[in-house]
Amino acid sequence: MLVGAARSEILPPNTVSTYGLTETCGGVVYDGVALSDVEVRLSNGRIHVRTPSMARSYRHGPLPLIDGWLDTGDLGTFVESPHDGSLAQGMLRVDGRSDDLIITGGNKVWPHIVEQRLREHPLVADVVVRGVPDTEWGAIVKAWIAPTSMDRPPTLDALRAHVKETLAAYCAPQRMTLVESIPRSALGKVLVSELPE
């Protein structure tokens, strides 16, 4: 089941998260736990994996492996196991792509967390959040909003106030662009290159 950015409260209770990459030839982590023969470690928050099922190379060159470890480009955290506590390092929580993280004025902002909050606003049908360069802050938070009605879209001030109710002020979008719809691939992935400036 592809759930993309679905809200957790609308997912069936038996939904589990899995994690894998093309390079690992499929899933390597099931519900936060590495499969047998799979090693997972974090280095500066970045997820590294080593598995016997690792691809040998890319079509046009070698995999960037160091001692068999692949830097996935994803950021993660080991969190306490809600099960019996027997997992020494905890369960893997994937926080997002390292290149998606917005650093604004030295503060870290995960776009998917801001998107989740903005989707809760009654005038927002869909949203995507990204960092855009800024000379003063390094980057600022920008939201592309597909409103429920283009005749009655939310204001930037209203959305900022909505975000600040539950998240830090620096997470609130500094800029907003209204769009009819968020451009997505057939699998629901946002087509960032098709977003208007």
What are these regions (language model features)?
Residues 1-32, 39-41:
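Gly/Ser/Thr-rich phosphate-binding loop
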Residues 29-32, 43, 79, 146:
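Short beta-strand-to-turn element immediately C-terminal to the catalytic PLP-Schiff-base lysine
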Residues 33-36, 41-71, 107-109:
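Conserved ATP/PPi-binding loop(s) of AMP-dependent carboxylate-activating enzymes
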Residues 44, 89, 185-187:
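Residue-level recognition of short loop/turn positions
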Residues 51, 73-171, 194:
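AMP-binding/adenylate-forming catalytic core of the ANL superfamily
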Residues 167-190:
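AMP-binding/adenylate-forming catalytic domain of the ANL superfamily
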Residues 189-197:
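Phosphopantetheine-dependent thiolation modules in NRPS/PKS and related acyl-activating systems
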